[in-house]
Curated annotation (Swiss-Prot):
This is Protein ROOT INITIATION DEFECTIVE 3. The keyword Repeat applies. SMART domains: WD40. The lineage of its organism: Eukaryota, Viridiplantae, Streptophyta, Embryophyta, Tracheophyta. GO terms for cellular component: Cul4-RING E3 ubiquitin ligase complex. SUPFAM superfamilies: WD40 repeat-like. It holds the Pfam family WD40. Residues 394-434 form a coiled coil. It comes from Arabidopsis thaliana (Mouse-ear cress). GO terms for biological process: negative regulation of shoot apical meristem development. Keywords: Coiled coil, Repeat, WD repeat. WD repeats lie at residues 36-74, 76-115, 118-157, 171-212, 214-253, 261-300.
Length: 438
């Protein structure tokens, strides 16, 4: 399996890429001047990065295919986007604006499915849970919020004036710099870092603070060890600290050790589980590969050459065997001969304009896969059906019938969930009324 490291900078140094095993430099993608957390490999099928002007007055989102160095698709949202994230399958792309608004696009069509006000100040980081059912956002205002994708698309909740988020964490006193989620499913924990020099461990299921870990310096970046016992914290004092997740005391310093990069501030981290390697980026434009067990330096990758070295502010690990794969969400743009999907729409379409914009969820029957695992809009399913109709083979006819049934079942499930929400809300309101009379 070929594993590639990609890295970007806040100045226009482009996106560098290297073979992780050999350190060989690969294709460089230009132009790119991305903010922190503004680079993502969408389903590991193509690259996307938000772009900011020097004064943050305008912004854009660029797409690159893996085979061409120049950006092929450019989108211009209504406001500058900082943080950018995609779910595992590459179905959705989510952007966090400087206003605190969050935008959710369907990748295959470019449609803006949902826009909502997430925070009081700019969104600094976004991350999906392992099963893609939850989105976690961090902000310059110090808050962290957990969003359920199903709840976001429940218009009944919005009409009732209910909060859209599942959890709201406000214990950080300064801007949130990074967020990671472990792989524990319903027992997962969230780890956040902030300019207040702390990392906090939160319970995702209980919605409460578990640990508060104080560090000697501001933590810019986080990475999780796959074992789930420790995490790595990249600091502004050029050190990478090792923090304990399962600390014995509720509060207090739980720093197990550190390794020094002997350079400038650590700005980003990534962990490659396939090779058990830790990758760091720093302000001096250097990408370092570490052995986390021995804490020894393995190799150095230079992002920018010459006198004009910009800080490395984003690192991603991409598995090239996955890049070559395709899934059903790619049908609509690949059928048009494009390597990557169309530009992102600026505005959310009014519901009354088309009922095809309804997002439906397809829970596989008798499957262990969570019901949140597959999200497709109805018009995207329609488009797939039309494309299959044009192909005309017996196999595609069978696939077309399957998609029709999937479409119908999704609409029925959407109606059932709507009724369940209404019934549950009615029960809660009745209980509150009974409690008030007592």
């Amino acid at each position: 399996m070929e594993i590639t490291v990609i890295a970007s900078s806040s100045i226009d140094e482009g996106i560098g890429s290297w073979d992780l095993k050999t350190g060989t430099e690969q294709l460089q993608f230009k132009p790119c001047a991305s903010p922190a957390h503004g680079l993502t490999a969408v389903g590991e099928k193509f690259l996307a990065s938000s772009q900011l002007s020097a004064r943050n007055t305008s912004g854009s989102i660029f797409y690159w295919s893996w085979t061409k160095p120049q950006a092929e698709v450019k989108s211009y949202p209504v406001e500058p986007i900082k943080a950018l994230a995609a779910n595992n399958e590459g179905t959705y792309l989510v952007g966090g604006g400087i206003s605190g608004d969050i935008y959710l696009w369907e990748v295959a069509t470019g449609k803006l499915l949902k826009k909502w006000h997430g925070h009081y100040r700019s969104v600094t980081c976004l991350v999906f849970s392992g099963d893609d059912s939850l989105l976690v956002s961090g902000s310059q205002d110090g808050s962290i919020r957990v969003w359920s994708l199903i709840r976001l698309f429940d218009d009944f909740q919005r009409q009732q004036g209910n909060t859209l988020y599942e959890h709201n964490f406000n214990e950080h006193t300064m801007s949130v710099t990074d967020i990671v989620i472990d792989y524990g499913g319903c027992n997962a924990v969230i780890i956040s870092s902030s300019e207040d020099r702390t990392c906090k461990v939160w319970s995702l299921s209980r919605g409460k603070l578990l640990k508060n870990i104080i560090f000697p310096s501001v933590i810019n970046a986080l990475a999780l060890d796959p074992g789930g016992c420790v995490f790595y914290a990249g600091a502004r004092d050029s050190k990478i600290y090792i923090g304990a997740i399962n600390a014995t005391s509720e509060y207090g310093t739980q720093v197990l050790g550190s390794v020094s990069e002997k350079g400038k501030a650590i700005t980003c981290l990534a962990y490659c589980a396939d090779g058990n390697l830790l990758i760091s980026g720093s302000e001096d434009g250097v990408v370092c590969v570490w052995d986390p067990k021995s804490l020894r330096h393995v190799r150095t990758l230079i992002h920018a050459k010459g006198s004009r070295k910009g800080p490395v502010n984003n690192i991603q690990i991409v598995r090239k065997t996955i890049v070559a794969n395709s899934n059903k969400t790619q049908v609509s743009w690949k059928s048009r001969g494009a390597l990557i999907p169309p530009p992102l729409e600026k505005y959310e379409r009014p519901v009354e304009d088309t009922m095809d914009g309804i997002v439906t969820v397809d829970p596989p029957p008798f499957s262990d896969v969570p019901v949140y695992s597959s999200f497709l809009s109805a018009d995207l399913i329609d488009e797939q059906v039309k494309e299959l109709q044009q192909q005309g083979s017996a196999a595609t006819e069978m696939e077309m019938e399957r998609l029709k049934l999937e479409y119908k079942r999704s609409l029925q499930m959407n109606e059932q969930w709507q009724k369940n929400y209404e019934n549950l809300l009615q029960v809660v309101m009745e209980e509150e009324q009974i409690g008030g009379t007592n």
